[in-house]
Amino acid sequence: MNFLITEISKFLLFWVLSYVLGNWVFHRNVKVNYTRKIHHFSLLFIPLFFATYFPYDRSGVISLIGSLAFVWTLFPFIFREKNTVIQRCFLGIDRPEDRPHTLLWLFTQFLASIMVIIPIAIVSEVFFDIAWENIGLFVICLAMIGDGFAEPVGIRFGKRRYKTFALFTRKRYLRTVEGSLAALVSTLLVVIVFNGLFTS
């Protein structure tokens, strides 16, 4: 499967999922905190699925373009005010506490992730002889799985609450000890799964 077909397939799959999740929020009153995390995991596992089962030859430039695929995947959300279908899709990620900056936070979150992952991957391959694809996947899993489990667990089981600041803002957000522990435990599990990357 070539690059273009793969990216179009991922794009369509993401948007079908977005529409389903948006309808869950609209018709079934499912909490956005849950649907947003399903989105969160889809941005990790959909590309991973295609990379595993439908690989294609990745040159340096193609790999870089592919790593920025989330930009054009999320881009249609910019036009949500003009299209009711896109509005419905947006419901699945639009947390009340993020409004009116929901899309800005999404773009900056993923751009910042790429800015961290790429240098780490390059340094790991050049100085430690670890394939950049492996270390890149490791870092992505650390960030997305840890954070992905924190919010649903905190919302469903959280009893012990505390407030903390988000990065680069003075706004305080409510978090739970249970959610934070879920992030810690799932992050440690990712480290265990990827233990083969580390030296003794």
Where are these regions (language model features)?
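Alpha-helical transmembrane segments
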Residues: 10-17
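Selected alpha-helical membrane-embedding segments in polytopic membrane proteins
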Residues: 68-74
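Interhelical loop and helix-boundary elements at the membrane-water interface
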Residues: 2-8, 21-62, 74-200
